[in-house]
């Protein structure tokens, strides 16, 4: 086997000269001292085998101490004529697993002669038989600034991190550096684990306010607010369609508080629906007020007087506060054209706090002349309120004269539109004008 590998050995029966033997001992010690600085700590206590194989036994060398390498001993000059047939065994690079985890070496490759010992000086560059670390060797030399490709630190490029990932776990590799004596530090600098800023931002640097800040920001978006308002209106419309009685409870509330000067549902419901439609939320209640004029007012002045008197009567009696906003409705008849009479409703809103007072009128409903004449004939000439109107209302005359007609809502029979709808239309216009007069609310 030795001959096949190209190593020529001295025959066992031929002992080496004494001078060569003496020179081989220090050169072998120097070779072992240099080699021990690149070997594993496991080889510190191993026994060495003499480099020459012959029949005469040689004394074993003392164990090599890796803590402090011995001083360099000058080697004897090599013979001028090299020995023919002497060859240096090729160095074989062990795998990383063998270089780090293999068993301790039991022997070194035998040197063929003293010349072989002389040729085994430490190499000028990094060893190729295995990766080792020294205190004076720069591992970045020869890489032109690139990261060194070593078995200890393989180069790789991590894929881009996407999404929010948990904080990385730093693993500390417990590897024993080769040939490190006491107090010797390795020249390798391992890269530190750096946290991804996106991870820390997603976990620690949460926006101020948390989930409530997010909800507040979304709710303040005009587009989101518009969608929510439309959705709310659709739900309320569905509920009020299925159960009309739920409308006052759904839209009741807010800062707007209004009192209607009547306890009749036809007036209170119409005003409530109109103001809640314009303001969104409004509290609207009804209180019966006295007009202190004739039951059937005649003319615009009488109608306006009756509406205002209802508000004043509630304030005088203490039913409502002096600063309370009130809405009053009063119907009257008027001859707009010769022998052409119409029924009209007068609506008044009064807000003493803001100094607002507005009037509006419903659409005019034609009333046949004969029914107006009957109401005039039923009113005594000495009636004390004759200056303001008639004692008998037009509704009472129509209820007695026509079938299926009521005094409170005869408008539906004549026009197909109920009195409540007429009051609602005028009240909505009144609420719109009132909203424009109000000062803007602070945000």
Curated annotation (Swiss-Prot):
One of its GO terms (biological process) is epithelial structure maintenance. Residues 81-96 have a biased composition (Low complexity). It is found in: Golgi apparatus; Cytoplasm. Residues 34-46, 169-188 have a biased composition (Polar residues). Its main location: Golgi. Gene3D superfamilies: 3.90.950.10. Keywords: Cytoplasm, Golgi apparatus. Residues 1-108, 139-206 are annotated as: Disordered. Belongs to the PRRC1 family. This is Protein PRRC1.
């Amino acid at each position: 086997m030795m001959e096949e590998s190209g190593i020529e050995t001295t025959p066992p029966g031929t002992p080496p000269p004494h001078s060569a033997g003496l020179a081989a001992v220090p050169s072998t010690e120097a070779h072992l001292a240099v080699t021990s600085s690149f070997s594993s700590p496991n080889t510190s206590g191993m026994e060495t085998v003499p480099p020459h194989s012959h029949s005469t036994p040689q004394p074993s060398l003392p164990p090599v101490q890796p803590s402090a390498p011995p001083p360099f001993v000058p080697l004897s000059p090599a013979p001028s004529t090299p020995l023919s047939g002497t060859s240096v065994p090729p160095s074989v690079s062990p795998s990383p697993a063998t270089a780090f985890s293999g068993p301790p070496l039991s022997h070194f490759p035998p040197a063929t002669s003293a010349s072989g010992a002389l040729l085994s000086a430490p190499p000028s560059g990094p060893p190729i038989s295995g990766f080792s670390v020294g205190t004076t060797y720069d591992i970045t030399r020869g890489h032109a600034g690139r990261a060194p490709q070593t078995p200890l630190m393989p180069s790789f490029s991590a894929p881009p991190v996407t999404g929010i990932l948990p904080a990385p776990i730093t693993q500390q590799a417990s590897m024993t550096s080769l040939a490190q004596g006491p107090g010797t530090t390795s020249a390798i600098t391992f890269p530190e684990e750096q946290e991804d800023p996106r991870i820390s931002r997603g976990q620690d640097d949460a926006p101020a306010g948390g989930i409530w800040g997010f909800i507040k920001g979304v709710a303040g978006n005009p587009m989101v607010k518009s969608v929510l308002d439309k959705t709310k209106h659709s739900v309320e419309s569905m509920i009020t369609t299925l159960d009309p009685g739920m409308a006052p409870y759904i839209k009741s509330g807010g800062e707007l508080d209004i009192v209607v000067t009547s306890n009749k549902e036809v007036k209170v419901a119409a005003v409530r629906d109109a103001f809640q439609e314009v303001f969104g939320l409004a509290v609207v209640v009804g209180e019966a007020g006295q007009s202190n004029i004739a039951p059937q007012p005649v003319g615009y002045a009488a109608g306006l007087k009756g509406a205002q008197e209802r508000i004043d009567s509630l304030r005088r009696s203490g039913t409502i506060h002096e600063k309370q906003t009130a809405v009053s409705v009063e119907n009257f008849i008027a001859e707009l054209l010769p022998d052409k009479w119409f029924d009209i409703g007068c609506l008044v809103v009064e807000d003493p706090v803001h100094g607002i007072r507005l009037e509006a009128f419903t659409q005019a409903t034609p009333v046949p002349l004969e029914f107006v004449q009957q109401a005039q004939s039923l009113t005594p000439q000495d009636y004390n309120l004759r200056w303001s109107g008639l004692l008998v209302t037009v509704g009472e005359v129509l209820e007695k004269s026509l079938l299926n007609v009521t005094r409170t809502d005869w408008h539906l029979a004549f026009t197909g539109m109920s009195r409540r709808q007429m009051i609602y239309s005028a009240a909505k216009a009144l609420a719109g004008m009132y909203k424009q007069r109000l000062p803007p609310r602070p945000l």
